[in-house]
């Protein structure tokens, strides 16, 4: 089993109920999963990581999704106890439509590394998308 989100950037802003099908979940997948599945006891933190990282990599047949010597450093650093309300105006990605607007959640993504390079940083509440184009796998 996997937990996935839709990483499809779009600049077309319109009300949620008028937007194309599908939800852009780049900024909401981790906090909503922590809030609704981990904090409620449905999943352990390890099971969440397996379903969002290890299992998708295994299904896709790519050598990713684990932290181990010699492996590629694709890492998301999360503060699982930080609380905030989802505000799509603060999203670093182009997609802004979300059914979670205003939802109170736990779990703030602080950094994202792809191929060992920081591509996203939220340092002291200042979100910075360092690279729009993610390095190739």
Regions found by a protein language model. Give the residues of each.
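C-terminal cap of metal-dependent C-N hydrolases
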Residues: 15-18, 72-134
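Conserved small/polar residues in nucleotide/adenosyl-binding loops
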Residues: 1-3
